[in-house]
Amino acid sequence: MGMDAWDGKQAAPPRRARRWLRWLMAAPLLFAAASVLQVLILRVVDPPISSMMVGRYLEAWGEGDWRFSLHQQWRDYDKIAASLPILVVAAEDQQFPMHHGFDLQAIEKARDHNARGGRVRGASTISQQVAKNVFLWQGRSWVRKGLEAWYTVLIELFWPKQRILEMYLNVAEFGDGVYGAQAAAQQFWSKDAAGLSPSESARLAAVLPSPRRYDARRPGAFVQRRATWIQRQARQLGGPVYLQGPSR
């Protein structure tokens, strides 16, 4: 009888282990469902703040700057100067209208460049930057990169290209604590985003790689040269009509 009881205990897996197993099996499905819901909601709802902005607050507070405040005000796509979207695409992601979230050619070029050493070159598309800035934290871990890829797939699947670009133009950092085209236009030139001139738009696009290092309002030689190059690239792409791309 004692042996039979022992065998029964050995055969039955502990309840706690079974619960953990069920949670481990359900967790990926729950995360996938939650992330899809996030993306579907933000297709139609303008976020009041992004994860990147939250991170900037935490960074400032961590440095003891409790008085830090950021500037951001949402503007719909059609309330932003037509020059800015095409200039941002010319600067950051010229294949944006055509790709589905990832520019494989740019990734290959960046990999070859970085293998030779020197300054590290990135290959993130606008879609990837939106995924990172809106949903995730800053960093270079493989976990974050994997989540970035997942969210990039989702926003390309559920959002039209114009929504992706609209989101980018409203959450991108154009100066220290200055997020989005409207805040940048007000802080730098005391105007609305709709009133940005082509040269002002080009300078905003020019500082995107390092918005805390470069100044769109008082541009140095590098920003001026880059802004001129960006304007030339935008003309070669065909101007704002280029953003229509293939039908989605």
Swiss-Prot record:
Name recorded for this polypeptide: Biosynthetic peptidoglycan transglycosylase
Catalytic activity: [GlcNAc-(1->4)-Mur2Ac(oyl-L-Ala-gamma-D-Glu-L-Lys-D-Ala-D-Ala)](n)-di-trans,octa-cis-undecaprenyl diphosphate + beta-D-GlcNAc-(1->4)-Mur2Ac(oyl-L-Ala-gamma-D-Glu-L-Lys-D-Ala-D-Ala)-di-trans,octa-cis-undecaprenyl diphosphate = [GlcNAc-(1->4)-Mur2Ac(oyl-L-Ala-gamma-D-Glu-L-Lys-D-Ala-D-Ala)](n+1)-di-trans,octa-cis-undecaprenyl diphosphate + di-trans,octa-cis-undecaprenyl diphosphate + H(+)
Keywords: Cell inner membrane, Cell membrane, Cell shape, Cell wall biogenesis/degradation, Glycosyltransferase, Membrane, Peptidoglycan synthesis, Transferase, Transmembrane, Transmembrane helix
HAMAP family xref list: PGT_MtgA
Pathway named in the protein's UniProt entry: Cell wall biogenesis; peptidoglycan biosynthesis
Bilayer-crossing regions: 20-42
A Gene Ontology term for the protein's cellular component: peptidoglycan-based cell wall
Biological process, per Gene Ontology: cell wall organization; peptidoglycan biosynthetic process; regulation of cell shape
Main location: membrane
Biological source species: Xanthomonas euvesicatoria pv. vesicatoria (strain 85-10)
Bilayer topology term: Single-pass membrane protein
EC numbers: 2.4.99.28
Major enzyme class: transferase
Localisation per UniProt entry: Cell inner membrane
Keyword match Metal-binding: no
Cited function: Peptidoglycan polymerase that catalyzes glycan chain elongation from lipid-linked precursors.
Molecular function (Gene Ontology), one example: peptidoglycan glycosyltransferase activity
Gene designation: mtgA
Family statement: Belongs to the glycosyltransferase 51 family.
Cross-referenced SUPFAM superfamilies: Lysozyme-like
